[in-house]
Amino acid sequence: MLAALRGKGTLDRSSILGLYRAFMGVGDAPKTLRRDTFTDSAQRVKKLVGELPLYYTEWNMCANFSAPCNDTSMQAAYDLHVILNSDDSIDGSSIWCFSDLFEEFHQFPEEFHGGFGLMTQSGIKKPAYHALRFLNEAGDTAYEIPHGDSVDAAVFKKENETHIILSMLDFDAKDGREQINISLESDEPSAVTVSKIDADHANPLRVWEGVGRPQVPNRSQLSEIEEESAPREEALPFEYRDGKILLNTDIGANEIRRIIIRR
């Protein structure tokens, strides 16, 4: 679904991109989009089409080609929220679009300019790309679990692994964290890891800023950005008691956690 943005935020007017954002009133988050706009729409359309297959072939969080949130974990959290909560209504979908190389609009010179893509024009993977990769790697067998009010959760079985994906979409980006306690009946695991997408992990925008915001990164800079912003697995402490795995983590606004339990 498409939306305009709320709040003008802090905008740099010294460049074409900054002037465009100021002229368009581009802020940091959608202002006309509810968390469940896509899900509610898909459910209504599914009732209309009945047994016919339903595909959403072009969707995204924001219609502004320059919105800062398109380059952040907010986009990733939105994509996961839509996918995890629309699976019963739609048969397939395609996020619009894969790359910031967008033929319908001129290209801004900045590598990170709020483009629609899952990757920048030089191929740097954004947080949304990694979030969808988490889903792709999780396997095809999903467990039925209750939906929470603020945190989206999904559990998948893949051979000798269990993948748990957590996401917390919050357009207002409020402070505060949710504590997640997990109890899972299972054989004793050999290892439990967590991968994070947030301000400090899998955030290529921050790494790009750290290397001087090059408009066209050279090969060395591209390699550094890719390496530093790739999600990493970290050991997650756990207990195994009475045939159950007990573990906990926390999550904040527009953050994502991928937990893998290996046996």
Label each PLM-derived region with a short phrase.
Residues 150-212, 250-258:
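Carbohydrate-binding surface patches
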Residues 104-109, 205-212, 217-222:
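Extracellular/periplasmic loop regions
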Residues 147-150, 176-178, 232, 241-243:
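Residues that act as N-cap/strand-start positions at coil-to-secondary-structure junctions
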Residues 58-175:
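Aromatic/acidic polysaccharide-binding cleft in carbohydrate-active enzymes
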